A protein has these predicted regions:
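Juxtamembrane membrane-water interface segments of multi-pass membrane proteins
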Residues: 2-7, 27-43, 58-77, 96-111, ...
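Hydrophobic cores of alpha-helical transmembrane segments in multi-pass integral membrane proteins
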Residues: 11-32, 44-65, 79-97, 119-134
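Alpha-helical membrane-spanning segments of integral membrane proteins, especially the hydrophobic core
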Residues: 114-118
Length: 141
């Protein structure tokens, strides 16, 4: 029996595959830090772990997307919002790891831009998944 995944699911899996590949590459960077200094910079470690976690979360997004009752464009938009925030978070961790400028980006006075981006991340990730989950519930129950 042949089954073709929807384009929204395939795009989600493609992006998720790149996130997983980045996790593997970040693991090499982390290993290098451990080998040279005994421990990788905290944000290199966080970037590696976050990329691994987000890659598996992306697989969950793909499953909920495929089983959603909502139109393709709705599912794809929700996926892209969530994945964009995943990628943005990883990128910010990589930046801090490269610059070695902090061990806690939320220590002290938090700049308005960072605070705003965190509110966006919260709304985007929870809202995007909420769309997919409600589509799953509507389509499967």
């Amino acid at each position: 029996m042949d089954y073709v995944l929807g384009i929204d699911t395939r795009i989600t899996l493609l992006i998720t595959g790149f996130i997983f590949l980045s996790a593997l590459l970040l693991g090499v960077w982390k290993y290098h830090g451990i080998r040279v200094d005994g421990a990788a910079h905290i944000y290199v470690d966080i970037a590696h772990r976050a990329a691994l976690m987000y890659s598996f979360a992306g697989i969950l997004l793909a499953v909920f997307t495929e089983l959603s009752a909502w139109p393709t464009i709705v599912n794809l938009t929700a996926d892209l919002v969530v994945l964009a925030f995943f990628i943005g978070a990883i990128a910010s961790y990589v930046l801090h790891g490269l610059r070695r400028d902090t061990t806690n980006q939320f220590d002290g006075q938090i700049p308005a831009g960072l605070r705003l981006s965190m509110y966006g991340l919260i709304a985007g990730e929870i809202g995007g998944f909420g769309v997919l989950f409600s589509g799953f519930v509507a389509g499967q129950f």
